Every structure is written in C-alpha cells, then in structure tokens.
A protein has these predicted regions:
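Short clusters of hydrophobic/aromatic residues that line enzyme substrate/ligand-binding pockets
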Residues: 54, 138, 161
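Conserved beta-strand scaffold positions in the cores of enzyme catalytic domains, especially
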Residues: 73, 147-149, 158
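Short, acidic/small-residue loops that bind anionic groups at enzyme active sites
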Residues: 129-153
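Ligand-binding beta-strand-loop-alpha-helix segment within the catalytic cores
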Residues: 151-184, 189
C-alpha cells in the first residue's frame, strides 16, 4: 500500500511553507498532500526559485507515489496577507484550521498519517486561542486520554514521560501511575505499528 501523508504548512510567516516546498521538490515513496494557503505557497515557491507545480487536491483520488516538483494542496486562505518573518495574530486561526482538517482527514482514513510543519505557540496564544503544542491539540481533538510523544533516530526510540510542560512542572507531573500509563501506551503503540523503521525494540530502558 502506498501511504498518503497530509502535511500541514504551519505558521505561514515562518519556515513551514519553505520546508513543505523543499520536500515536494524531491520524489517520495508516499503520496503527499499539503494543507495551507495556496497563495502563500505560490509566493514562497517563486521567492525560493523552486519549480514546484501546485494544484488543488481532489478528495478520493487514487494514491500514487509523490512525483518531484508537484504538490497537491488543500487551500485554507489566510485572513490577512502574509509577510515572511512578520507574525500576525489575525492568521493564527488558519494555523489551527490546518491541524483540524488534517486530523479529520486521518480519522476518516483519507490520509494515513500527518506531518506537521513548525507553528508559533506565542502568536496563537496572543490571538486568544490556548495552545501548548501539537501533542495536546491532537489529543484533545481525538479524545486521547494519555498521549505519548515518541522520538526516533534509526534504531533508537525515546518516549517522553510528559508532553509540553514548563520545566518547573515536570517533577510533580511524573508519578508511578503516570509512568505506568505512558509505558502501556508505548508498548501497545509499538506492537501495533507495522512500518519497518518502527519495529518493536529488543530492549526497553526506563
């Protein structure tokens, strides 16, 4: 099966659109679908001197491996014009709309996984939308009780005992009960993953 990955472009004034376009310039053994502002992507495409062909994504189309210099896009326009490196709280809602749509696509099995470009937590909160990170946002949208973040680097996999917390709050948040919950989620998750780069480890260190 060829997986279809939905990629959020993140904060439009940041590096997110650039990362997505640079990714789309190469070939990949999966189908890529971007969620973001088509106008911003087109402007960054030109400014970076790339030649990525942007086209609207059609729901339900057959899955095919990504061809270099192409990018299907689900357009979510910005509220205000975007200037690179200049944050605008009026556009913060568009960032969260990307995540909401990407989550819906995965839950509907239209897409098989989500990749997220960087966001700016500060500007989202300044806009009056409480946001501590992707992990908590996705946990809330999917009614997930105990989300666990997993970092991978080759054969090494590191699960974090907390999500996004101030450092001062970390010690009191780690308890025998919370560790047991996280370890159970980790063990169950690793057993259910079929991709070769995330096979069940032969040892577990705590």
């Amino acid at each position: 099966m060829i997986p279809r990955l939905v990629i959020t472009t993140g904060e439009s004034a940041g590096i997110g659109p650039d990362i997505v376009l640079a990714t789309a310039a190469a070939s990949w053994p999966a189908q890529l679908v971007a969620v973001g502002c088509m106008e911003t992507l087109a402007a960054r495409n030109q400014a970076l001197g790339l030649n990525v062909s942007l086209a609207p994504y059609t729901s339900g189309q057959n899955t095919a491996e990504h061809r270099a210099n192409t990018l299907p896009v689900i357009n979510i326009p910005l509220n205000k014009p975007c200037t690179p490196a200049l944050l605008n709280p009026d556009n913060a809602g568009q960032v969260l709309a990307q995540l909401e749509l990407a989550t819906e696509l995965c839950r509907a099995q239209e897409c098989h996984a989500m990749v997220t470009a960087p966001v700016h937590k500060g500007i989202i909160n300044t806009a009056g939308m409480p946001f501590s990170g992707h992990t908590e946002f996705l946990a809330n949208k999917t009614s997930t009780d105990a989300p666990v973040m997993l970092l991978t680097a080759g054969a090494l996999k590191v699960a974090l005992a907390t999500t996004h917390l101030p450092l001062s709050a970390v010690p009191e948040s780690i308890t025998p009960h919370s560790l047991e919950k996280s370890l159970r989620v980790l063990a169950g998750g690793l057993k259910s993953v079929s991709y070769t780069h995330l096979t069940l480890p032969t040892s577990l260190a705590v």
